[in-house]
């Protein structure tokens, strides 16, 4: 029988803890969010984050970039926020407008304000397993918290991460490696027969490539833990990268879409923000 990993329930607990921590701060906890207002998905996500932040007592400053924004102008904006003592954390909501070099923007965020852990300094510390005073990218850290909540062991397990983005795949690989899993990083261009062989041997599968039903139940090892980071819309409904129905009865644990990783990402981002406030009071 497949057990559902309830991200909503775990996120609720995290949010309650975050709210209590925010209440103890002497100064307002403020998250600046830079985003492209022409992207409907970004507008949706920014709105969701802002509403949840307000419930926890976190102030958000949503900053839409103009249609004529350049990499240089966005970096200048980030540097101004770095110097603004009223700003606790900074989030750069991806994707930004075409032509803007996102990695340069991520790395312009000061490490002590990097709420989503996407800058080169923070990600370098993550790969060096030296993250004592830094936050981790919210989605992969949320996955790790969810696994821990369900007491899913990682030590010595074969794990496959499908997706290599800076937001998800690369930090996910590092976190699982640091937790003593044996990790393989695959992606949408991995040769299909190679990917199928990897999946059949994987105790842990974490996938986020943005392709609906990219992985089928028949691809999975019996009893595997399957974490679906994908969020796609098919016929007006949210759909993950894993064919959920076909994985039933094969996976030991699985996250639903929606209600799995999504709530954990937002909860972890806001948890990261109050952590930054505590570290730099």
UniProtKB/Swiss-Prot annotation:
Keywords: Amino-acid biosynthesis, Histidine biosynthesis, Hydrolase, Methionine biosynthesis, Multifunctional enzyme, NADP, One-carbon metabolism, Oxidoreductase, Purine biosynthesis. InterPro entries: Aminoacid_DH-like_N_sf (IPR046346), NAD(P)-bd_dom_sf (IPR036291), THF_DH/CycHdrlase (IPR000672), THF_DH/CycHdrlase_cat_dom (IPR020630), THF_DH/CycHdrlase_CS (IPR020867), THF_DH/CycHdrlase_NAD-bd_dom (IPR020631). Pathway: One-carbon metabolism; tetrahydrofolate interconversion. It catalyses: (6R)-5,10-methylene-5,6,7,8-tetrahydrofolate + NADP(+) = (6R)-5,10-methenyltetrahydrofolate + NADPH; (6R)-5,10-methenyltetrahydrofolate + H2O = (6R)-10-formyltetrahydrofolate + H(+). NADP(+) binds at residues 163-165. Signal peptide: none annotated. Pfam families: THF_DHG_CYH, THF_DHG_CYH_C. One of its GO terms (molecular function) is methylenetetrahydrofolate dehydrogenase (NADP+) activity. Its EC number is 1.5.1.5, 3.5.4.9. One of its GO terms (biological process) is L-histidine biosynthetic process. Gene3D superfamilies: Leucine Dehydrogenase, chain A, domain 1, NAD(P)-binding Rossmann-like Domain. PROSITE patterns: THF_DHG_CYH_2 (PS00767). The keyword NADP applies. GO terms for cellular component: cytosol. The keyword Signal does not apply. Belongs to the tetrahydrofolate dehydrogenase/cyclohydrolase family. Homodimer. HAMAP family: THF_DHG_CYH (MF_01576). Catalyzes the oxidation of 5,10-methylenetetrahydrofolate to 5,10-methenyltetrahydrofolate and then the hydrolysis of 5,10-methenyltetrahydrofolate to 10-formyltetrahydrofolate. This is Bifunctional protein FolD. It comes from Leuconostoc mesenteroides subsp. mesenteroides (strain ATCC 8293 / DSM 20343 / BCRC 11652 / CCM 1803 / JCM 6124 / NCDO 523 / NBRC 100496 / NCIMB 8023 / NCTC 12954 / NRRL B-1118 / 37Y). The lineage of its organism: Bacteria, Bacillati, Bacillota, Bacilli, Lactobacillales. The gene is folD.
């Amino acid at each position: 029988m497949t057990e559902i990993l309830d991200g909503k329930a775990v996120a609720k607990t995290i949010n309650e803890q975050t709210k209590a921590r925010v209440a103890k701060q002497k100064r307002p906890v403020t998250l600046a969010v830079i985003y492209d207002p022409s992207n409907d998905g970004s507008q949706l996500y920014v709105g969701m984050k802002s509403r949840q932040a307000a419930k926890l007592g976190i102030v958000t400053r949503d900053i839409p970039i103009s249609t004529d924004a350049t990499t240089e102008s966005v970096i200048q904006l980030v540097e101004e926020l770095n110097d603004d003592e009223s700003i606790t954390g900074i989030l750069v909501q991806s994707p930004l407008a075409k032509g803007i070099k996102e990695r340069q923007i991520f790395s312009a965020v000061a490490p002590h304000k990097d709420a989503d852990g996407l800058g080169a300094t923070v990600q370098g510390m993550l790969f060096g397993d030296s993250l004592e005073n830094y936050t981790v990218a919210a989605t992969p850290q949320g996955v790790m918290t969810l696994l821990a909540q369900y007491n899913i062991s990682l030590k010595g397990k074969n794990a496959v991460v499908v997706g290599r983005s800076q937001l998800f795949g690369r930090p996910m690989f590092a976190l699982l490696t640091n937790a003593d899993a044996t990790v393989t990083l695959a992606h949408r261009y991995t040769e299909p027969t190679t990917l199928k062989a990897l999946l059949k041997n994987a105790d842990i599968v974490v996938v986020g490539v943005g392709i609906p039903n990219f992985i089928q139940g028949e691809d999975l090892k019996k009893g595997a833990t399957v974490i679906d980071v994908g969020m796609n819309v098919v016929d007006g409904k949210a759909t993950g990268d894993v064919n959920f129905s076909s994985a039933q009865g094969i996976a030991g644990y699985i996250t639903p879409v929606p209600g799995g990783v999504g709530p954990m990402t937002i909860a972890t981002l806001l948890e990261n923000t109050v952590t930054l406030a505590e570290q730099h009071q």
